[in-house]
From Swiss-Prot:
Its EC number is 3.6.4.13. One of its GO terms (biological process) is response to cold. It catalyses: ATP + H2O = ADP + phosphate + H(+). A motif (DEID box) lies at residues 153-156. Keywords: ATP-binding, Helicase, Hydrolase, Nucleotide-binding, RNA-binding. Residues 233-383 form the Helicase C-terminal domain. Residues 34-205 form the Helicase ATP-binding domain. It comes from the Bacteria. This is Probable ATP-dependent RNA helicase MG425. The keyword Signal does not apply. The keyword RNA-binding applies. ATP binds at residues 47-54. A motif (Q motif) lies at residues 3-31.
Length: 449
């Protein structure tokens, strides 16, 4: 039987704030973890993407601050990325609205002196990246003699980014804390071992029901597709998919920063409103691009690495495209989890080469009862690139290209239909008059199958 926030020990004042944020009832992870948190137990929480993990620790922390003296010892929350830190800070700020709590974020890419000034206001809640926190400790600009709570979010990503040593260094610099809790959307064995060690074998909260909730939601709200392509066909397929889909918001995931920049330029040249996001971008650019994408009313594309694959909440994402196939199950779930949120239907499309097919299908079978559909069922029409469909001396005109593609069949991997970029290259070598003599018609597309 589901519990209410009141039954979990949350005050009416805070419940009213939650209701104003359209948080009317606790998720399963919140139902189980909040009472344990309020009892000051050390916790190890496994909570997949989209199950309300951030609010699961933000709500009880704010509840305790409202009941206790607000000059009490501070809470420190550590997260692996700047974007996730800002997202967590926003969650705290929204839930603590009009409660006069001081909440600050400490991240790289922002002048340290500005953050030192904020530290001097004696904030009750500090959210930061490990790198900036350790930097400020070395400068002696901040100290943690005592903490109320220490929260480590997405601990597996922290370890993946090489912060194991820093985690233990941080613990050595904290004289005492009432409570420590570790949260993550996924745990490998190393993450489990570290979590047990730093929480002194804290209470583990995780259940197949949480995964079931997430996966059932995905099955109902998110349509999954796979497109089997050669690597050199992906750009044209991406452009065609975006133009055919005609949706407002799309996230395109890539496996390298260089590829993000490359696709950003490619889509911009083809007159698509696109923004790029990765770790090498300056902080103000990252914040600006994410803010524009989150609040835009125009069709917009965000090309990114896994930087926002987890923890970043942008509502009503219509489509996720894995331009680089994701062969890690947890990462795939996290990417897919950017869409299908708050009962908003979404689509997840993965571009997959023949070499990746077997591994990808085996991976996806673990989270869906149905075989993943192929892109040909989406009726994607191949559309010529705008930036290449220009008349060149001895080349091909836009009109001629439009004739070739006017009635192109949906992409069919079994027949290995050449995509527009390949066909265009082959035609570029032929003068337009010669093509007219050959009487190229729509069925010329079929002859290339």
């Amino acid at each position: 039987m589901d519990s209410t926030f009141h039954e979990l020990g949350i005050s009416q004042t805070l419940i009213e704030t939650l209701n104003a944020l359209h948080i009317n009832k606790p998720t399963k992870i919140q139902q189980i973890s909040i009472p344990q948190f309020l009892s000051e137990k050390n916790l190890i929480v496994h909570s997949p993407t989209g199950t309300g993990k951030t609010a699961a620790f933000a709500i009880p922390i704010i509840e305790k601050l409202l009941k206790e003296d607000q000059t009490a010892k501070p809470t420190l929350v550590i997260a692996p990325t700047r974007e996730l830190v800002e997202q967590i800070k926003t969650t705290f700020s929204n839930i603590a609205k009009n409660k006069k709590l001081r909440i600050i974020s400490l991240i790289g890419g922002v002048p340290a002196w500005k953050q030192i000034k904020k530290i001097k206001t004696n904030p009750q809640i500090i959210v930061g990246t490990m790198g900036r926190i350790m930097d400020l400790l070395e400068r002696k600009a901040i100290h943690f003699s005592d903490l109320e709570h220490l929260i480590i979010d997405e601990v597996d990503l922290m370890l993946d980014r090489g912060f194991k040593k820093q985690i233990f260094n941080l613990l050595e610099q904290i004289n005492s804390f009432k409570q420590i809790a570790v949260y993550s959307a996924s745990y490998n064995q190393e993450a489990i071992n570290i979590a047990k060690q730093i929480t002194n074998n804290g209470i583990f909260i995780g259940s197949p029901e949480f995964n079931k909730d997430a996966n059932t939601n995905n099955d109902k709200l998110i349509k999954q597709f796979v497109c089997y392509l050669f690597s050199d066909q992906k750009k044209q397929a991406l452009y065609s998919l975006i133009k055919t889909a005609q949706v407002k918001s799309i996230i395109v995931f890539c496996d390298t920063k260089k590829l993000v920049d490359d696709l950003h330029v490619f889509l911009r040249k083809n007159e698509l409103r696109t923004f790029a996001l990765h770790g090498d971008k300056k902080q103000f650019i990252r914040e600006r691009n994410l803010k524009i994408f989150a609040n835009t009313k125009q069709p917009t594309i965000l090309v990114t690495t896994d930087l926002i694959g987890r923890g970043i909440h942008v509502e009503a994402i219509d489509m996720v495209i894995n331009y680089s196939a994701c062969l890690n199950l947890e990462a795939y779930i996290n990417r897919m989890g950017r869409t299908g949120r708050n009962n908003h239907k979404g689509t997840c499309v993965t571009f997959c080469t023949s070499q990746e097919k077997k591994v990808f299908l085996k991976m996806v079978e673990k989270i869906t009862d149905n075989r993943i559909a192929e892109c040909k069922q989406m009726e994607i029409k191949l559309i010529p690139l705008k930036n290449k469909a220009k008349t060149k001396k001895g080349g091909i005109s836009l009109d001629c290209v439009q004739k070739i593609y006017a009635n192109a069949k949906p992409y069919d991997r079994n027949k290995r239909v050449p995509l527009a970029s390949d066909l265009f290259k082959s035609r570029m070598r032929q003068p337009e008059k010669a093509m007219q003599k050959q009487k190229i018609h729509d069925n010329d597309w079929q002859s290339n199958m």
